[in-house]
């Protein structure tokens, strides 16, 4: 009887370890028109058992971001700029995204090159761990394996047509 329970427990742990990632940072919409001003939304869920306390997004070189919606209540926003003054990313901090919750961060941008744009993001949790969403983007409809709390997960991708 005890051996059966141990086997069942081991199987449950193995299944959880191989579970697909059900939540990751997304950029919406996933398909945009070339040279059209677009409202982009970065959707950030908290998929760990620790709240999210900061989010950094690196903008793809093929998209010019030029305006930001106000940061959600309790959050501050800091634009990241290149040496030439162009906006290359944004950092949101100061608030929390509770366990099981999500928050949207919105800004305007214009894509100026066709093809796939990759939006790398870095999610900081209340325990100080940073989850890089900087790996290769998933294929449409694919669900990646969970890579753990600090290993790179798939970056978000937007197709420019």
Feature-to-residue mapping (PLM):
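Sec/Tat signal peptide C-region and signal peptidase I cleavage site
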Residues: 19-23
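Low-complexity, intrinsically disordered segments enriched in Ser/Thr together with acidic residues
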Residues: 95-115
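Extracytoplasmic/periplasmic copper-protein system
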Residues: 32-34, 124-161
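Short, solvent-exposed loop/turn segments enriched in Ser/Thr/Gly
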Residues: 35-40, 104, 116-119
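Bacterial N-terminal signal peptides
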Residues: 8-18
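Bacterial N-terminal signal peptides that target proteins for export
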Residues: 1-8
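Low-complexity, serine/threonine/proline/glycine-rich extracellular segments that form mucin-like
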Residues: 35-69
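A surface/secretory-pathway sequence property marking extracellular, secreted
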Residues: 60-88, 136-139, 153-158
């Amino acid at each position: 009887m005890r051996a059966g329970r141990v086997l069942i427990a081991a199987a449950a742990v193995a299944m959880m370890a191989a579970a697909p990632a059900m939540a990751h940072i997304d950029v919406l919409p996933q398909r945009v028109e070339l040279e059209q001003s677009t409202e982009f939304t970065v959707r950030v869920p908290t998929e760990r058992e620790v709240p999210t306390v900061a989010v950094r997004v690196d903008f793809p070189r093929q998209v010019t971001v030029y305006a930001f919606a106000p940061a959600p209540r309790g959050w501050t926003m800091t634009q990241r700029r290149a040496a030439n003054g162009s906006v290359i990313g944004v950092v949101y901090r100061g608030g929390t995204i509770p366990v099981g919750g999500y928050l949207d961060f919105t800004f305007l941008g214009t894509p100026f090159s066709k093809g796939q744009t990759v939006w790398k993001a870095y999610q900081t949790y209340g325990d100080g761990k940073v989850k890089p969403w900087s790996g290769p983007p998933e294929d449409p409809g694919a669900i990646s394996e969970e890579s753990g709390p600090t290993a790179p997960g798939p970056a978000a991708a937007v197709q420019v047509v």
